[in-house]
Amino acid sequence: MADRAEMFSLSTFHSLSPPGCRPPQDISLEEFDDEDLSEITDDCGLGLSYDSDHCEKDSLSLGRSEQPHPICSFQDDFQEFEMIDDNEEEDDEDEEEEEEEEEGDGEGQEGGDPGSEAPAPGPLIPSPSVEEPHKHRPTTLRLTTLGAQDSLNNNGGFDLVRPASWQETALCSPAPEALRELPGPLPATDTGPGGAQSPVRPGCDCEGNRPAEPPAPGGTSPSSDPGIEADLRSRSSGGRGGRRSSQELSSPGSDSEDAGGARLGRMISSISETELELSSDGGSSSSGRSSHLTNSIEEASSPASEPEPPREPPRRPAFLPVGPDDTNSEYESGSESEPDLSEDADSPWLLSNLVSRMISEGSSPIRCPGQCLSPAPRPPGEPVSPAGGAAQDSQDPEAAAGPGGVELVDMETLCAPPPPAPAAPRPGPAQPGPCLFLSNPTRDTITPLWAAPGRAARPGRACSAACSEEEDEEDDEEEEDAEDSAGSPGGRGTGPSAPRDASLVYDAVKYTLVVDEHTQLELVSLRRCAGLGHDSEEDSGGEASEEEAGAALLGGGQVSGDTSPDSPDLTFSKKFLNVFVNSTSRSSSTESFGLFSCLVNGEEREQTHRAVFRFIPRHPDELELDVDDPVLVEAEEDDFWFRGFNMRTGERGVFPAFYAHAVPGPAKDLLGSKRSPCWVERFDVQFLGSVEVPCHQGNGILCAAMQKIATARKLTVHLRPPASCDLEISLRGVKLSLSGGGPEFQRCSHFFQMKNISFCGCHPRNSCYFGFITKHPLLSRFACHVFVSQESMRPVAQSVGRAFLEYYQEHLAYACPTEDIYLE
């Protein structure tokens, strides 16, 4: 049964997936703590851009909304999944029954009369009984192209059978032609009241009518599941007189009221038993199921699903949505790698999303075992419904969800200067306070973050979270915390709210954009984020309303970052934002890609060593080190111990000498800059974050990093707003400088040598985003650093390009002389 199951899964998902489509890689929030961004760009960016057609997705949602009846019953379907792969004993029984049927067919041909050529359409197929309230799904897949058939002459190449008694019919099974085409063993067919068995004629019904052709792979049918299409088409074809044969080769238009019986009709023709075990595993998140199913499907269908390079379809807005015309296909990035962050969470070709959408659009409440595919919990006051709100968001991203709901605007509106009129229509009462808006073109469930149970989302300052299924660990924690807080009728207390704040710590969920009262990107300094109390008076009234909504969680009316219960994150101001990991994480970050410097005792000092091992102090005078910590060695002891300063934590102490390696300093670059006077340009921008990438150049790589960094920070706007920084560009390289919050960390910087900068550029659709890729000084590793500004960042890109060009023109003469080519 293994080969049949694989063939079954392969053919099913060949019809479910568009041509040349690769399963999107998992882009989840917890991946920021791992070594790199390989899940985005495993194949150097070529796996980033495969997004299905937005027109197809719109037609999918529109087509399904026309059918208000319940699609299917998942309780019966989950109970009958075992019919797909049966045991070997039934295989042996079916083989014996097949031999008996062949003998019976031979007898029928010898003793058949002309009256047996046309079967009686009336009593052959029993009507559904009272115990079967739901229409059954089709039992098989049409795996071959059917030839022309004539029901009168019966020239379709199938054997005739004589009317048999009920004793003989009980021992008969499907014809060999149909049995070879079925994915698994089928039980014996039932008979009508007259005792005559319906002839086995795959591909046509009892009156010789050809069934509807199956949808082409990647077509815009109302649903991508053949089982759903069966129910949808059976409504339109119900007026025909004839009913489908029980052994028809899975026309998606079959009515399923056939002689297959209850077990035969409940078989779902899209999931094998092995995949069912993955999809119904209790306690696991839906993203785990989705990724496992996608991986198994990719392995099975990789030879057949990529016959030719995919053509470029019109795409939905992918990276930072910019304005009302972002559904066009004019994006020319010079690379095929245009990723969509939530494609894997919302692609209609994923099986888990088919199931979840069938759940959300059925008129009757349907629940899977353990509610494994149910949407995220929603407060009672939230007006967005699973089907209506999601469809409304997908069709008009700028439309408001309701008077008290979540309003969605695009990213260009957020970055643009304040317009005289509102950027998006706001039905209902006017909203006095500012709101945090997130673009949601991918039909994610929108839930307010701080909405208390029994109270609607505050219209003054609504914080929305796109609860994608792929954000498994983060959303699991948040859903559990939301259920715990909803269970307490007394409102949100600090006790049950602490785990939610723990799930929103800076190093777990990074890079969120913040919007002020003018719907612009709010430029928040690091001093405000560092915990200075006097900054709380500078907050606007809208931010005060946000603090009031989350007062119990964040503690009082202070700045949200001030009262974070995470003691390791209290020293956040001493870190170079997300570039440095906290003391509890052992994962390597991107701080080793440049030289870190900060003010120590009023003097700017650069790091001299980099920690290569984690050192846990055992005495009070020892210094704790984490991997890749920047260290300033002040003295070298005789016993191979160093006395130094950890620039990440701001602590001094001794540590073993072999726990840190010296970093190459820019001595030659300094000498070169002193000989020839160099220019320096400074820009005031906001630093969003750094993330490691597997390739040193490419617009696709750059846009993927920007997309991941900018969209993944949308949950931590209150805790970790973007920090302002000065970008100094010269022939030496690029230096990032930002202010700290402590007396000892008034200013810290990160320097990237020009020889290690390999690529830079602005976002093709939104020039407010800029990033550059740097190489590790010693290793073959690459990191992308992303910045944002209220204005266009093209002058920054031009300045870096100018410095890049001049540097290589100056050093190319001795670094790569042309005469070396002809030495031989």
UniProtKB/Swiss-Prot annotation:
UniProt keyword annotation of Hydrolase present: no
Calcium keyword on record: no
Positions of the UniProt region annotated as JNK-binding domain (JBD): 110-275
Keywords recorded for this protein, A-Z: Cytoplasm, Phosphoprotein, SH3 domain
InterPro entries listed in its UniProt record: JIP1_scaffold, JIP2_SH3, PH-like_dom_sf, PTB/PI_dom, SH3_domain
PROSITE patterns hit by this protein: PID, SH3
Disordered, as annotated region: 1-28, 40-160, 172-349, 361-501
Annotated tissue distribution: Expressed mainly in the brain and pancreas, including insulin-secreting cells. In the nervous system, more abundantly expressed in the cerebellum, pituitary gland, occipital lobe and the amygdala. Also expressed in fetal brain. Very low levels found in uterus, ovary, prostate, colon, testis, adrenal gland, thyroid gland and salivary gland.
Domain SH3: 604-665
PID domain residues: 677-813
Region of interest called Necessary for interaction with FGF13, as start-end residue ranges on this chain: 239-498
Biased amino acid composition, Pro residues: 416-432
Phosphoserine PTM sites in chain numbering: S254, S302, S305
Single GO biological process annotation from the record: regulation of synaptic transmission, glutamatergic
Bias-annotated ranges (Low complexity): 268-305, 451-467
UniProt similarity note: Belongs to the JIP scaffold family.
Role noted for this protein: The JNK-interacting protein (JIP) group of scaffold proteins selectively mediates JNK signaling by aggregating specific components of the MAPK cascade to form a functional JNK signaling module. JIP2 inhibits IL1 beta-induced apoptosis in insulin-secreting cells. May function as a regulator of vesicle transport, through interactions with the JNK-signaling components and motor proteins.
UniProt name for this protein: C-Jun-amino-terminal kinase-interacting protein 2
